[in-house]
Amino acid sequence: MFFSGTQSQRCVSEKRLRRRTPVRHKHVREVIRRLGESVGLDLDLAESFLEKAHFEGRDLILVDRVPLGMHVETGDGRSWFPTLRGVIAWQPERCWAAVDHGAIPFLMNGADCMGAGIHLADPSLQAGELVWIRDEEHGKPLAIGVALVSGDEMTEMTNGKAVSTLHWVGDDLWELET
C-alpha cells in the first residue's frame, strides 16, 4: 500500500511514541511543579487530560494529547522543561535567548546556536541550564537547548557556541502527530 508523504511520516511518528499511559494529576503533581519552576510559571493542569509517554530517549508529559513537557539531560542531571509547544502554550518569561534573523535558518535545521547571533538573553540564565531560543523580532520560539555560557556572556559573544540545541521547530518531536 502506498501513502502520500504526509501520511507515511505521520505513521512513523506515531510508532515512535512509546509507553503512552494516562495518569492522574496527583501522580505527576511533582513533575508539573518542576516543569513550571524551570521557566518561572505556576502551572494549573488539574482539569487537563494528562499522559506520560516516551519518545526517542525522552520522557514526555502530554497535556490534552499534546506533548508540552520533556525530561532532558543537563549538566546538573535530568530536568523537566517545556517542549516548543509548551513554550507556545505557556509563554514563559524566563530562560530565553533572542536571536537575529540570520540565525533562524540554521536553528530550523537543528544547528547549535552561535553566540554572535544572540542579541538579547535572560540575565538570570546560567551555564548548564535549559534555555528556549526565540526570534528577536516576533518573539516566536525556535529551539530549546542547554546554555553553554551565562545569559550576560551570550549577548557579548562574537564567536563560538552559546547554546547546544536539543529540540527545534521541524524536528521529529515538533512533527509528532498525537
For each predicted feature, which ranges?
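Beta-strand/loop-dominated core regions that host nucleotide or nucleotide-derived cofactor-binding catalytic loops
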Residues: 2-58, 62-119, 124-127, 133-178
